[in-house]
């Protein structure tokens, strides 16, 4: 059975006349007759009966007409979807993330993708940086987001934005610094940094920012994540440094002051394999901003 046979059959059934169907299809009558006969032979049934006006569907033909229309409809949908997939307009983008990028930066980027490819789907999985690299190699994710990725052959690391840094502390303590505080003013502050694992990490970057400002930070604890750091800071153990995405959220009894001096920013990066870029990933990558690390 061929798709052209279905098209010819539907045209004859709807027109009730082979000549009219030929004019509709812009072909001569003999090819239609041959293909209808071949279709009947393939199905093992008679689809049409001749009348003085043309042809009429048999009972078998009436039943097959419904199926033929359904088959062509499904085929057309498949054709449209496959072409859209090849253009990166549909498909599933499998995204992994680590850290606070999921709070603000990543949702904004995914919103851009869905605005140009509304039929696309997105899956999100939290993964450490090393697991993201393993998942890229295994082909179980398309792209990962985080900070400070280690070098891995075949994996592209691309900086997509830079976030400002903020001091986080009990609200009254944070307010005492004003709207901005320079690194040099925090020389004697006890710091709670994060994360403990996945070095180099955000904690290493924060230490580097202070050292570039000629300040040796007094680190009293390096904890698992931002939640633990903020909990200890709220308890009065010390102060912490967080990226802008965390400071954008309203936290009860917790305040933030912008850190300035010595390029007090941290990058948000994405990683993907250069030799495995699916069309939907290519569409997403074309939407991502390109930023220089600061």
Swiss-Prot record:
Cited function: Involved in regulation of chlorinated catechol metabolism. Transcriptional activator of the clcABD chlorocatechol oxidative operon.
DNA-binding region: 18-37
Pfam families, sorted: HTH_1, LysR_substrate
Keywords for the protein's UniProt record, in alphabetical order: Activator, Aromatic hydrocarbons catabolism, Cytoplasm, DNA-binding, Plasmid, Transcription, Transcription regulation
HTH lysR-type domain segment(s): 1-58
InterPro entries noted in UniProt: ClcR_PBP2, LysR_subst-bd, Tscrpt_reg_HTH_LysR, WH-like_DNA-bd_sf, WH_DNA-bd_sf
GO biological process: catabolic process
GO cellular component: cytoplasm; protein-DNA complex
A GO term for molecular function: DNA binding
Designated name of the protein: HTH-type transcriptional regulator ClcR
UniProt family annotation: Belongs to the LysR transcriptional regulatory family.
Domain of life: Bacteria
Subcellular location: Cytoplasm
Keyword Cytoplasm among record annotations: yes
PANTHER family listed in its UniProt record: HCA OPERON TRANSCRIPTIONAL ACTIVATOR HCAR, TRANSCRIPTIONAL DUAL REGULATOR HCAR-RELATED
SUPFAM superfamilies associated with the record: Periplasmic binding protein-like II (SSF53850), Winged helix' DNA-binding domain (SSF46785)
């Amino acid at each position: 059975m061929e798709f052209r046979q279905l098209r010819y059959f539907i045209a004859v059934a709807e027109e009730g006349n082979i000549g009219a169907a030929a004019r509709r299809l812009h072909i001569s009558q003999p090819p239609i007759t041959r293909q209808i006969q071949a279709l009947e032979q393939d199905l093992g049934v008679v689809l049409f009966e001749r009348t003085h006006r043309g042809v009429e569907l048999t009972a078998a033909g009436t039943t097959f007409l419904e199926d033929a229309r359904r088959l062509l409809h499904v085929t057309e949908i498949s054709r449209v979807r496959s072409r859209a997939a090849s253009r990166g307009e549909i498909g599933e983008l499998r995204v992994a993330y680590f850290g606070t990028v999921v709070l603000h930066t990543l949702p904004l980027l995914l919103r851009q993708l869905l605005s140009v490819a509304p039929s696309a789907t997105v899956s999100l999985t939290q993964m450490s940086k090393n697991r993201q690299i393993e998942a890229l190699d295994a082909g179980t994710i398309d792209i990962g987001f985080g900070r400070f990725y280690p070098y891995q052959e075949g994996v592209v690391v691309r900086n997509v934005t830079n976030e400002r840094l903020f001091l986080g502390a009990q609200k009254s303590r944070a307010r005492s610094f004003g709207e901005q505080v320079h690194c040099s003013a925090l020389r004697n502050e006890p710091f709670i940094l994060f994360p403990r694992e996945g070095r180099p990490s955000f904690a290493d970057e924060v230490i580097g920012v202070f050292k570039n400002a000629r300040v040796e930070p007094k680190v009293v604890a390096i904890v698992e994540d931002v939640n633990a750091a903020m909990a200890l800071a709220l308890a009065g153990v010390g102060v912490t440094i967080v990226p802008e995405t965390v400071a954008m959220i309203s936290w009860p009894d917790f305040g933030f002051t912008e850190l300035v001096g010595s390029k007090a920013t941290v990058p948000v990066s994405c990683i993907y394999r250069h030799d495995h870029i699916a069309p939907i990933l290519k569409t997403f990558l074309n939407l991502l901003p390109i930023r220089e690390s600061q």
